Structure formats: C-alpha cells, structure tokens
Regions:
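Solvent-exposed loop/turn segments connecting transmembrane beta-strands
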Residues: 6-14, 28, 40-45, 71-77, ...
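Outer-membrane beta-barrel translocator/pore domains, especially the C-terminal barrels
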Residues: 133-137, 147-149
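Flexible, glycine-rich linker and terminal segments associated
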Residues: 54-59, 157, 161-179, 185-258
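Transmembrane beta-strand segments that form the barrel wall of outer-membrane beta-barrel proteins
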Residues: 1-7, 32-34, 64-67, 89-100, ...
Length: 258
C-alpha cells in the first residue's frame, strides 16, 4: 500500500501495489538491488493542485507528477549496483550507481570509519544525481546536482535512550545545512525515528512549516524491511536522497543493543 496523506486535494490518497524487492550477488562484493512496482488500483489521477513553493529548486515538491503515473505500467523504484570495499581495518567504502530511488538516478560513494563494537562512527557521502522523468523508467529530466554530507553517528542506550545521527552538507536542491535524526531500535529490529533539517533557506522562504521534518519506521519482515516515512509537507529545502540503506546501519544491524 502506498499512502499519500494530507494533500490539498484530499486528506488521504493511495495505491494498492504489487511490489518486488530483490538483491543479487553478482560476484564477491558486487550487489545488484532492484525494486519494481505495479499499481493494481490508485486514486492519484486528480492530484492536480501545483505546489505553493519550489524554492530553491524543484526536487521533491513535484511528487504529484510522479504519483499520477503510477497507473501507467511497471514502475522502476530502484535498479542499483553497489560495490563494497574495506581497504583497511575499520575503514569501509561503498560505490553505487544506477536508479537510486523513485525520483533520482546517479552515481556516488560512501565512506565510514567504524570500529567494531564502538558506539561512535564518522563518515561522508557524495552523490552526483539527476532527476528522473515522471514515468519512472529510464528517462531523465534536466535537473542535476552534487549532494554531499558529513555524517556523525552515536549509539549507546546506556547514556541516551535513542540513536543519534547528525549530518552536515549540501542537499538535493542546493541548500546547505544540518539534519538531526533521533531513532530507537528495538530488540526485534523494529526502528522508529524522527528527523528535522535546518538549512540556509529561511523560514520565510520555506513557507508553511518553517523547516523540513518528519517521522519514519522500519519493520523487519521475511528477511526484508517495511520502510515508511511521513512529512507534514513535501517541500524542496532539506531534501536528501532516499537511500536503500547506509553503511552504518548495515554494520550495526546484527550488533546487540546495549
């Protein structure tokens, strides 16, 4: 089920989807992952009211254009090739390329310094991305940008009742700032979190809502995850790539929670 909540056309819109998520180990350290969707039924056709603000660049506020094409056949949500590499103990790299999410293609890499068993980690990521066309197959729009972030992680439930991630950098729309993410992972693997981003886009320029913020949850099921996030408003400032996962989450996935 793909919900779209609190649009100006109606409080709740949605789609009933058949969805396939797959991962293939092509060879050692090379993983190809895909996400395909097909809409059995949806009511996105009348999402016609344009966004009030598209500042500083339209990277997320045109979400309705993508949703309206959900009923036009198979949608490619992701088709991504990853190469994982550990050049030195505690130093981890991942190179990625392809269709990274529903709205962006691109190539990039992620680095993480993480010592096994440590409560701290630090890393950075850089991605050269291009906006996908609204049919969500292989075409692209004109918009391009390089987005990059320095990421700091802290996880110690003996001191804080939540995981903390702080990111500094440039977002998809070209604005710069900081994102604070607080989450809690439970012993069964379920994760709930909240986030907020504060960038060089002022609250007046941002408009209603003042800054980007939201909640999310990840629920493990049958060896995979149900992922969902919600923002009260879908705007462009503070927008980041919707990543399949990150190196830190992969490395601590099976670590006992202390």
């Amino acid at each position: 089920i793909r919900p779209f909540i609190a649009s100006r056309e109606a409080f709740l819109k949605g789609a009933l989807l058949i969805e396939n998520n797959a991962e293939y180990a092509l060879r050692e350290n090379f993983i190809f992952s895909s996400n395909l969707k097909y809409s059995i039924a949806d009511n996105f056709d009348d999402l016609t009211i344009p966004p009030e603000d598209t500042y500083p660049a339209q990277v997320r506020s045109d979400i309705k254009e993508y949703l309206r094409d959900f009923g036009d056949g198979i949608i490619i949500g992701r088709a991504q090739l990853d190469y994982y590499f550990t050049p030195k103990k505690n130093h981890h790299l991942r190179f990625s390329g392809g269709i990274l999410e529903e709205m962006f293609n691109g190539v990039g890499f992620e680095y993480l310094y993480y010592k096994e068993g440590s409560n701290y980690a630090i890393g950075f990521e850089v991605f050269d991305v291009q906006k996908r066309d609204y049919e969500m197959r292989f075409g692209s729009l004109d918009y391009k940008n390089v987005t990059s972030h320095l990421n700091l992680h802290f996880r110690n439930y003996g001191r804080l009742p939540f995981d903390t991630k702080i990111s500094f950098g440039e977002y998809l729309a070209g604005d710069e700032g900081i994102t604070i993410d607080l989450s809690r992972t439970f012993s069964n693997g379920t994760k709930f979190g909240v986030f907020a981003s504060f960038t060089d886009v002022s609250s007046e320029q941002f408009g209603e809502g003042s800054f980007d913020k939201g909640i999310y949850f990840n629920i493990p099921i049958f060896g995979n995850y149900i992922n969902y996030s919600w923002r009260p408003l879908t705007k462009d400032p503070g927008a980041k790539l919707i990543r399949k996962n990150n190196l830190h989450d992969l490395l601590v996935k099976f670590r006992p929670i202390n």
